[in-house]
């Protein structure tokens, strides 16, 4: 047995091997040690190999999905090795014969289909990278085998990471030579364990057509459209990996669909991370934009919403069509609510279909399809006759074209209460199959039939204590007390009828030909009933898989309806407006709000969000958008203001209403954000280096249709260095990139740039000082700030009072120019607790005569009236100076 294990493991060295042993999957050697640590299960041993104990651990077959989920989440890949025969068959080949086993599938992060292993709200993409040898031409193909989605797009080295980040695959396969390519290696290093090298033959574009024709069972690929060599390489790699992992099974994949270049808003990886579109910087969905806007009621709808958010459009017409769909449901609240009530009960049609096609589905997957199709019919009835916009009309047309015969057949065939596993039976509705009903009656009514036979025998023999019983050894038998046995074996006639089976201390057991025949019929009835049900299951699955294309289309149509209705609910509940998205260079937001922060303020503090305008539209006579130079205090809301405008652009171009009173946005083709500070120590890059690399990427790529938000460029180095870099960056944005931009800074000297840069506008975050306290108004106004109020923020943060006072003193000296040029440079980079600068806090500036009066007072000896008189006297002294 161990030799068999070693041979199978050698063929799947990059996977943990789940080796079937009866009711367990067992792991040995290094696999056992890895799995025991990852799963928290006991590591034991079984036998020896080369004189050493063999480490072993195992998991029950019935709970395997739970353990697979943990391993996949940790990035492991698992080869599932099953027993291909039963022990009896193995013994026929000899008493020492080892049971045949083979790997039936590879479970990898990008190829899972089990409901337990998948997040219903997230797509699960496998991606392949194709490259033409000796060329810069690259392409990406991505598949979700759990839903059948298959897409392909061309890319280039400079935007490869951005395109991969947009799709966010769970697994990226690349040819081994590409994996070791020095130019692409940094990209793969950033992606980590997601990247899996595979044999180059998988990506052979020359044999791609033959591989695809075989996979789809077609003679020609003419109906698929034309693809470049790099695209064919990526497509072939993806299909080859699916064949490798799924073995004999084939998922119902759609034909590859090209994702046209320029169709989506370009957002680089750091911008996606900074804006926290789908996940926060801590990788949590909670607190992300997606979480804030998701009002969908189906898994497919949630996945489509995420896809649209991650790939906003750049075509104003298609954007308008999506907005029309949202407006339609906003204007039809009653229809919308009824539709959403239907959709709430819709199971995941695409994923159920995929499991059935891969022979991993059960009766409940058929039930999910049946329920989904019924909901689709109900949704179609709701929308029928309505004057709906084009996207909704197209969805309705798809739902109306569903195969009615399949819907009816599933409804007639499936029981209301379905078991999880088909081997349990009981999933075919009574009345569907006459023979099945007969077998079930015999199986289920066996007790009644046996009881009737027992009554007949009691009446015939006169033995009132006679019982017909059952055990696993004898089957059914007749039992009488020993003193009554003579009635059953006392005569030759009785002996011929009642066949002796067993003698007990106080009883004897018999059988009859009639009882044996009945037992055989009962046993056969159960087996026959299950066989009939399994045959019905296979027929139904065959019909479903044959109709996979219209079923997938219906699932997508329901997802479109869910997203449109959900965005209407969002717009109504959060008071969002419909944006105007056109081909201009405008960017005019009135009363804009941050969609995530607004909800958090309301939920946690019960406070409203302060709305602000933003106008980056070209001024009269200008051919390029404006740049707002934003100054103001720490904690004033600069970063929030920057992000909210970027998020409004993303929401508008994904086809959603936006958090504002009004919004007019000329299509943004590239969105860049440099907000926040982080380092990259693994690659030897400091916070400032990361900042400069990201800023360089923006300045090298932004064009006139870009929207750029930059926050505190240059803060990671010495003051004058940082100011110089920020100054030059603004000039470059203005003169070379000519893009719409928001640039926040604490370098107040930069406000003078508005005198020489015509499209630069000074704006500031308003504050109010009251009795020595700073009140942050979070309002954006025209003009420039002259202070950053950093010391006030430090005090609010809880810095020791001596530190705060010392900071005030240093600031006062710097502002008054008391220190020389050299000292000023030293202070610029001075550590907070430098011993050289440690001084006593500044003395109080209270007048001497006031101090004398206060010192002379003895509060313990004063009456209330005297104390009041002294208080008035002290007040006069202060007023008179």
Swiss-Prot record:
It comes from the Bacteria. The lineage of its organism: Bacteria, Pseudomonadati, Pseudomonadota, Alphaproteobacteria, Hyphomicrobiales. This is DNA mismatch repair protein MutS. ATP binds at residues 632-639. This protein is involved in the repair of mismatches in DNA. It is possible that it carries out the mismatch recognition step. This protein has a weak ATPase activity. PROSITE patterns: DNA_MISMATCH_REPAIR_2. SUPFAM superfamilies: DNA repair protein MutS, domain I, DNA repair protein MutS, domain II, DNA repair protein MutS, domain III, P-loop containing nucleoside triphosphate hydrolases. Gene3D superfamilies: 1.10.1420.10, 6.10.140.430, DNA repair protein MutS, domain I, MutS, connector domain, P-loop containing nucleotide triphosphate hydrolases. The keyword Nucleotide-binding applies. Belongs to the DNA mismatch repair MutS family. One of its GO terms (cellular component) is cytosol. GO terms for molecular function: ATP binding; ATP-dependent DNA damage sensor activity; damaged DNA binding; mismatched DNA binding. GO terms for biological process: mismatch repair. Keywords: ATP-binding, DNA damage, DNA repair, DNA-binding, Nucleotide-binding.
